[in-house]
């Protein structure tokens, strides 16, 4: 049973999938940092210093806090600013992945665009062709 598991785990698809998951997680962290540390501050500067992740709407009268962390302690809140930030994060990840897939597709098409020259006929095929031609002329 251990041997079967080892054979399964070492198949190309399983190993490729594991590598893809690890790279995907690292890529997600990079994009999250790009959104939180680069894009959102720029958007905040353009909109007058707004930090969308701290926007919320209290769902009860007991919520009087002005920041999200304290408001969550006071009661139920609708953290729509955080949702907006995560949605923007998703859109950026999706766009970057789209660009990567598009680039890879272009490379693949470029490789496919140059078809390989047909292989030269083997000596055996040449002889058979000559024999065929001789038989045709004898008829």
From Swiss-Prot:
Supply the alphabetized keyword list: Cell inner membrane, Cell membrane, Ion channel, Ion transport, Membrane, Transmembrane, Transmembrane helix, Transport
Q: Name one GO molecular function term.
A: mechanosensitive monoatomic ion channel activity
Q: Which GO terms describe its cellular component?
A: plasma membrane
| Keyword field contains Cell membrane | yes
Which SUPFAM superfamilies does the record cross-reference, listed alphabetically? Gated mechanosensitive channel
Presence of keyword Phosphoprotein: no
The listed locations are: Cell inner membrane
| Gene3D superfamilies according to UniProt | Large-conductance mechanosensitive channel, MscL, domain 1 (1.10.1200.120)
Return the InterPro entries for the record.
Mechanosensitive_channel_CS, MS_channel, MSC/AndL, MscL_channel
Q: What Pfam families does the record tag this protein with?
A: MscL
PROSITE patterns from the xrefs? Answer: MSCL
Membrane topology (UniProt): Multi-pass membrane protein
Q: Give me the segments passing through the membrane.
A: 19-39, 81-101
Q: What does this protein do?
A: Channel that opens in response to stretch forces in the membrane lipid bilayer. May participate in the regulation of osmotic pressure changes within the cell.
- Subunit structure as annotated in this protein's UniProt entry: Homopentamer.
* Family classification: Belongs to the MscL family.
Put simply, this protein is called Large-conductance mechanosensitive channel
This chain's source organism reads: Nitrobacter hamburgensis (strain DSM 10229 / NCIMB 13809 / X14)
Give the taxonomic lineage as stored in the record.
Answer: Bacteria, Pseudomonadati, Pseudomonadota, Alphaproteobacteria, Hyphomicrobiales
**Its encoding gene is what?**
mscL
């Amino acid at each position: 049973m251990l041997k079967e598991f080892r054979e399964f785990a070492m198949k190309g698809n399983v190993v490729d999938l594991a590598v893809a998951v690890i790279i995907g997680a690292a890529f997600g962290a990079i994009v999250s940092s790009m959104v939180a540390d680069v894009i959102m501050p720029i958007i905040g500067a353009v909109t007058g210093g707004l930090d969308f992740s701290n926007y919320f709407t209290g769902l009860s009268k007991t919520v009087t806090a002005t920041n999200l962390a304290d408001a969550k302690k006071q009661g139920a809140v609708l953290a729509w600013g955080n949702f907006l930030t995560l949605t923007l994060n998703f859109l950026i990840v999706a766009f970057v992945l789209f660009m990567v897939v598009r680039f890879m597709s272009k490379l693949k098409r470029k490789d496919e665009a140059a078809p390989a020259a047909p292989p030269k006929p083997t000596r055996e095929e040449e002889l058979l062709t000559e024999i065929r031609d001789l038989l045709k002329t004898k008829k």
